[in-house]
Curated annotation (Swiss-Prot):
It comes from Niallia circulans. The keyword Hydrolase applies. GO terms for molecular function: phosphatase activity. This is 5''-phosphoribostamycin phosphatase. SUPFAM superfamilies: Phosphoglycerate mutase-like (SSF53254). The active site is at 8 (tele-phosphohistidine intermediate), 155. Belongs to the histidine phosphatase superfamily. PANTHER family: BROAD-SPECIFICITY PHOSPHATASE YOR283W-RELATED (PTHR48100).
Length: 213
């Protein structure tokens, strides 16, 4: 079984200036024109050897839009949205509004104190990790007997936590090192259900974005 984890393409909420005001966490943030171009390149240059057996996606709009463009090449492949692939859960509104810089600080604090809800309604890193682990455990049970390629569209933190889970490492490792998760980059992992072992074959693969023409 191969897992192909892909971060969504560039979205408007990814390019905010540090002093930009946020009155809410935006799950409906749309792709930029550059992001649409990234998703098109991913679709067109995606390796035939990794043709998907099934496609999973976070329900957040930026992930769904990326998956939707990708699926243009694979319209008959089963598609599943799973809430457990969402980015962190956050308050419906910030009163008073916060800046993008303050939001980034909250994300750093989640790493330093993974068991804490930094602000009311902001999901802790540990809770996020737990739901992602549940997703994979269910996935492995469902496809344990199949030689398949499973494409998963999700978010940067979800990819970080997924890889920690595959390696059997705790969230505290994020204080020491992190794995870059660029927009539309592929992280390819082979899973052997017999031994329960993982092999990281490629991380943050952006080769499709290097093509010209």
């Amino acid at each position: 079984m191969r897992l192909i984890l892909i971060r969504h393409a560039q979205a408007r909420c990814n390019i905010l200036e540090d002093d930009a005001l946020m009155d809410a966490y935006d799950p409906h943030c749309e792709l930029t024109e550059a992001g649409i171009g990234q998703a098109v390149k991913l679709r067109d240059e995606y390796p035939v050897s990794l043709t998907p057996s099934v496609i999973y996606s976070s329900p957040l709009k930026r992930a769904r839009e990326t998956a939707g463009i990708f699926r243009g090449r694979y319209p008959s492949v089963p598609f599943v949205e799973d809430e457990r692939l969402s980015e962190l859960k956050a308050p419906e509104s910030f009163i008073p509004p916060i800046t993008q810089g303050q939001w980034d600080l909250y994300l750093e604090q989640r790493i330093r104190s993974p068991h804490l809800e930094i602000v009311k309604g902001l999901e802790s890193l540990d809770v996020q990790r737990e739901r992602i682990e549940r997703f994979y455990k269910d996935l492995f049970r469902k496809y344990a007997e199949e030689a398949c390629n499973i494409v998963i569209f999700t978010h940067a933190f979800s990819i970080q936590l997924s890889i920690l889970f595959f390696l059997g490492l705790g969230n505290e490792q994020l204080l020491q090192w992190q794995i870059k998760a660029s927009n539309t980059a592929m992280h390819i992992i082979h899973y052997d259900p017999t031994s329960g072992s993982f092999l990281l074959e490629s991380l943050n693969n952006r080769s499709h974005l290097q093509t010209t023409g």
